[in-house]
Amino acid sequence: MEKAKPYNLEERTAVFAEDVRKFVKRIPRTQANEEDGKQLLKASGSIGANYIEANESLSKKDFYYRCKVCRKESKESAFFLRLIDTGNDESLETERRQLRQEANELKLIFNKMIGTN
């Protein structure tokens, strides 16, 4: 059963970054996965960090800029999740699909916040 998603977006982005970290610890250790995993870790954590910055911004312009960065990092997270090789592990594949869906949902939320589709 899938766990309920936090309503608070700051918490939701933190949970996403935590879930990505747990996932990366479990993937097969290949050279490609090591590199893609590093990029995924950076992008997933950057979503939440930039959202915190957006909430603390001093102007609307800065708020929108930070939300655009969040959207970009969400797209990057989905991209690197796509590249990671889970081997033949069905549970890892299921987890990857769920994480990709969450990255896409975060992207859509930030799209809405900045007023683009």
Model regions and ranges:
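Short, C-terminally biased terminal segments at protein or domain edges
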Residues: M1-E53, S57-N117
